[in-house]
């Protein structure tokens, strides 16, 4: 996400602002994997979006290797820190963080609610200790193979603020079931 200019196949924060776009996903695992986007580039995108008053949805997540080797939490906290470097505290209340465990996307493996809550709780604690945010204002959504089978548990957890639905959003019936699983 460049601030402005012509970048074929990309869109700038300026263009999004002119279209009155309110939210933009940055750091998605597919962008990191296929386009080699780094945390530092995600940070540039986040700053460009905030400067245009667009809420960034910052994706972060670990691979299966990082998870099984046991160093995943350090990796995740590093992603968060590098993606939010240099942000003014008064500008970051609107950021949404999307926990997207790469090992649970399209693999048939699902993160348990306990896995999700563990990561989100530790990341919230880390962020508030670093004084980036007021812990109560930090918003987290989950995006690791959300389906009608796991959406009720995820979307009705007190610590998870929503879902970043991937493949299931392409099937209208599945997507409607996910939406209907929310207790209002």
Located regions from the model:
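Active-site loop-to-helix "anion-binding N-cap" substructures in soluble metabolic enzymes
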Residues: 1-184
């Amino acid at each position: 996400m460049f601030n402005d200019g012509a970048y074929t196949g990309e869109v700038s924060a300026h263009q999004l602002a002119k279209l009155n776009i309110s939210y933009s996903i940055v750091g998605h695992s597919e962008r990191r994997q296929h386009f080699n986007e780094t945390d530092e580039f995600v940070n540039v995108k986040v700053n460009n979006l905030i400067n245009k008053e667009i809420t960034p949805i910052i994706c972060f997540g670990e691979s299966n290797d990082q998870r099984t080797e046991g160093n995943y939490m350090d990796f995740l906290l590093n992603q968060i820190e590098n993606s939010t470097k240099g942000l003014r505290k008064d500008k970051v209340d609107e950021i949404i963080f999307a926990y997207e465990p790469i090992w649970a996307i399209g693999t048939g493996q699902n993160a348990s609610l306990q896995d999700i809550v563990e990561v989100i709780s530790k990341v919230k604690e880390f962020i508030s200790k670093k004084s980036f945010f007021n812990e109560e204002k930090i918003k987290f959504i989950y995006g690791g193979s959300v389906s009608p089978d796991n959406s009720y548990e995820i979307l009705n957890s007190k610590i998870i603020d929503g879902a970043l639905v991937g493949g299931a959003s392409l099937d209208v019936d599945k997507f409607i079931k996910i939406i209907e699983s929310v207790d209002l």
